């Protein structure tokens, strides 16, 4: 089976609940883009969508979120560009090596105020481990053989990760709550 993701293939390393953050780096050999996170990530998960950056050969990304005010570009920010300005998540990638350093939502959205990051871009240890796998069936749209998808789901199960073809129930509930509040069907003070 191809690589699920380097952070998952050989077993998941538990994170440190007291971890305070660290630096992310692009893959350039010099003049690396550096992003500093002043907190650990939340909702860290494997994602099979076609938009997320994935390490070479991996079927999934591993992506978590931090509050926008916990992220700062601390070196070579001039090398960043937005990959797709029409996407809900504005993925900021290095122009030279193509690595996505962070994704920011700029329009009205349930997750506005959170930045999406890939902790494998850090040398620091202690980041929250993956909590679940999302958009699993989306790898089929990208060319993965449908008759092998059950083996992918089984690999996640063996690692203790629940698989979804959307986000986790908690995140889907947050989206539904946001949508209900925006439509006026739910009180804005829950």
UniProtKB/Swiss-Prot annotation:
Q: Which GO terms describe its biological process?
A: formaldehyde catabolic process
Q: Which reaction does it catalyse?
A: S-(hydroxymethyl)glutathione = glutathione + formaldehyde
Q: In which pathway does it act?
A: One-carbon metabolism; formaldehyde degradation; formate from formaldehyde (glutathione route): step 1/3
GO MF assignments: S-(hydroxymethyl)glutathione synthase activity; zinc ion binding
List the InterPro entries hit by this protein, alphabetically: CENP-V/GFA, Formald_GSH, Mss4-like_sf
Cofactor(s) it depends on: Zn(2+)
Identify the residues that bind Zn(2+) 1. 26, 28, 94, 97
Cysteine pairs forming cystine bridges in this chain are: none
Coiled coil (UniProt feature): none
Span of domain CENP-V/GFA: 19-165
Cofactor binding note of this UniProt entry: Binds 2 Zn(2+) ions per subunit.
Q: List its EC numbers.
A: 4.4.1.22
- Report the SUPFAM superfamilies cross-referenced here: Mss4-like (SSF51316)
Q: Does the keyword Transcription regulation apply?
A: no
Which residues are noted in the entry as Zn(2+) 2-binding?
A: 47, 49, 52
Q: Which UniProt keywords apply?
A: Lyase, Metal-binding, Zinc
The record's section on HAMAP family has: Formald_GSH
The protein's role, per its UniProt record: Catalyzes the condensation of formaldehyde and glutathione to S-hydroxymethylglutathione.
Tell me the protein family, please. Belongs to the Gfa family.
The protein depicted here goes by the name: Putative glutathione-dependent formaldehyde-activating enzyme
